[in-house]
Amino acid sequence: MQIVVVGVDYKTAPVEIREKLAFAEAELGAAMKQLAKQKSVLENVIVSTCNRTEVYAVVDQLHTGRYYMKAFLAEWFGVKVEAIAPYLRVLEGEAAIKHLFRVAAGLDSMVLGETQILGQVKDSYLLAQEVGTSGTIFNHLFKQAVTFAKRAHSETGIGAHAVSVSYAAVELAKKIFGRLAGKHVLIIGAGKMGTLAAQNLYGSGVGKVTVVNRTLEKAKQLAKQFAGEAKPLGELSCALLEADIVISSTGAKGYILTKEMVAPLEKMRKGRPLFMVDIAVPRDLDPALADLETVFLYDIDDLQDVVAANLAERQKAAARIETMIEAELMAFSQWLQTLGVVPVIAALREKALAIQAETMKSLERKLPHLSERDWKVLNKHTKSIINQLLRDPILQAKELAAGPNAEEALLLFMKIFNIEDAVKAERHIEQAKSVQCDEQDAEAVRAARPSWQL
């Protein structure tokens, strides 16, 4: 069995290709069920976001599995395989497993270290459980990947620092005021960057938002998003008296606020600090405003410097996570290798215990005079002999499973002990148990899903 991932992302395909291969959320479960019917595909999970569509699968034959995974994508979206093939990323084995860990941890995201993808990976896995396309291998792998990604974020703090200009403004505001609860935000203009900064500030718990714009109607539309107040540009000075934080992005030709305009307001503000962020190009706020004692002025270049420094910190954290992933790969590989040897060991034990049981029956016929206590002692000691005899072969089987050419080595091991048929029977039993457990897990997921959040 092999693990394969086939898909597109923002690195391999332009948006016009990605949008053609994006699954609607409502159809994702049906798509996984359809993929499960494809030849060679044993398990599957599909992750589909605005930046990526990736099909993860456990296949019994590598070449056949790859072929049918590509064919499935082409058929589902009504395109030819040849049309999408140049944009597809195809990874196999350890490379595919490593990719999942990197994706879940946010290392493969457009915004390095973002956490939204972790929730999306988790939701896709939960859905696969619900529809029955995730089995023993993916249940283990995806749980491990999600758990690891949470730990990686917690231990490295990769997402702790802003890497967008709009959120960098929030970070600076927190450094000046500490807590933002109850602070009054004044938005000058209705530009995109200013709006994003306002959204981030509002999400951080500021108390009130006022929007000032040349066009009052636009100011009202933006203010409505934050349950705020709209004012015409002529009332800017009055709005400044109440504000703690000013975000300006008007796109005006000259300065809309100068040192001479703000200086008279300082006494009226009674020394309250005024945090001003100029996101406009050309600038809205006179650089001389920084000379005022209570004004903290930052422009777009200052914010870019903050973002660059924060990105460098994220890259350091990402390097740590890459190292952590290597340990996770080793742990999963060891688990996967032992997965194949479990039925072999079980069959070997069953054969040995069957021989011991037959021997005990023979002894009962030949030694009818033995007491019940004698039989208990005899049974205990014969089982002890069995366990001692099996100890070295079991250790050897585990080593074979972890070594090169494990499949061929285990086949030879089974032939030596004549347990091929018994191993097949054990695997059927394990498969039946796995299906039953998966059904129980899926039922538990359906019952608990609303409360299982990141």
Swiss-Prot record:
PROSITE patterns: GLUTR. The keyword Lyase does not apply. Pfam families: GlutR_dimer (PF00745), GlutR_N (PF05201), Shikimate_DH (PF01488). NADP(+) binds at G189, A190, G191, K192, M193, G194. The active site is at C50. One of its GO terms (molecular function) is NADP binding. The keyword tRNA-binding does not apply. The record marks H99 as: Important for activity. Its EC number is 1.2.1.70. Substrate binds at T49, C50, N51, R52, S109, E114, T115, Q116, Q120. Gene3D superfamilies: Glutamyl-tRNA reductase, N-terminal domain, NAD(P)-binding Rossmann-like Domain. Pathway: Porphyrin-containing compound metabolism; protoporphyrin-IX biosynthesis; 5-aminolevulinate from L-glutamyl-tRNA(Glu): step 1/2. Possesses an unusual extended V-shaped dimeric structure with each monomer consisting of three distinct domains arranged along a curved 'spinal' alpha-helix. The N-terminal catalytic domain specifically recognizes the glutamate moiety of the substrate. The second domain is the NADPH-binding domain, and the third C-terminal domain is responsible for dimerization. PANTHER family: GLUTAMYL-TRNA REDUCTASE. This is Glutamyl-tRNA reductase. It comes from Geobacillus kaustophilus (strain HTA426).
